[in-house]
């Protein structure tokens, strides 16, 4: 009996896509297909070959190919979308909507054609709106179209808390809700260091500064790079989500999910805690929010809906 190997296709062979592909292969989670536009087919093949040639050194067994032909992605278990125009310094996420939504629709049609049973994970910004666009175009069940932002935003939040307390990031837990933008909602009340509430360890003004830095985390890196945006942490976040799906781990992770009444919102994709497993989003977890937390989430939802108004 032949055992079918897992297959993940990564759409977009830029910094984030290529890093994601390499991390997936390193962890031996699946065979990887790295896809980009025909004009970039040779560089995409070159990156894939370069990764493959690292396998004897890194000690992993996974096949990696580069292509511009979506037929090569057929029967993927998971498809990760990182393609889209890059965010530039001073550029708002809203500016990305019109162009990237057109790109999403084109990509999604190819995914649906060749991998109708896949789970799609979207990274392209503005990710809440782009995930909604992919969902509408694909016609897949809502649990199989997921956006990635909460894992990344929470990772940034945890990093800054660990730095503040001079503790291991492994001992920091937390959640960031809402849209992936300046109105995201880091939930201090649900965040802990070794099980101890942060509010007992960090002064209020320092916590407020950490929350604000988390909200501006992506922009901080964009400004420092001068060209392009973050890719190591986004790629690592995509891999964590993909692993939870492929291994049916049923991880509790923040992810962008389609809401139908949860938290009082409907017909939009928003970052919320979910159980992530082999079927995609197995369950949306509704946290009890205080009045000020709900007001902050309302503002975040308003920002997401404003971006969605310009979807094409």
UniProtKB/Swiss-Prot annotation:
Binding positions (NAD(+)): 12-17, 36, 100, 123-125
GO molecular function list: L-lactate dehydrogenase activity; L-malate dehydrogenase (NAD+) activity
Phosphoserine modified-residue sites: 149
Keyword Nucleus on entry: no
Binding site for substrate: 87, 93, 125, 156
Enzyme class, UniProt record, top EC level: oxidoreductase
Pfam families: Ldh_1_C (PF02866), Ldh_1_N (PF00056)
Alphabetical GO biological process terms: lactate metabolic process; tricarboxylic acid cycle
Domain of life: Bacteria
Signal sequence, renumbered to the chain: none
Entry keyword set: NAD, Oxidoreductase, Phosphoprotein, Tricarboxylic acid cycle
InterPro entries assigned to the protein according to its UniProt record, in alphabetical order: L-lactate/malate_DH, Lactate/malate_DH_C, Lactate/malate_DH_N, Lactate_DH/Glyco_Ohase_4_C, Malate_DH_type3, NAD(P)-bd_dom_sf
E.C. designation(s): 1.1.1.37
Residue numbers annotated as active site: 180 (proton acceptor)
Record's catalysed reaction(s): (S)-malate + NAD(+) = oxaloacetate + NADH + H(+)
Function recorded in the entry: Catalyzes the reversible oxidation of malate to oxaloacetate.
Family membership: Belongs to the LDH/MDH superfamily. MDH type 3 family.
HAMAP family hit by this protein: Malate_dehydrog_3
NCBIfam families with a match to the protein in the record: MalateDH_bact (TIGR01763), PRK06223.1 (NF004863)
Protein's UniProt name: Malate dehydrogenase
Annotated organism of origin: Bacillus anthracis
Organism lineage string: Bacteria, Bacillati, Bacillota, Bacilli, Bacillales
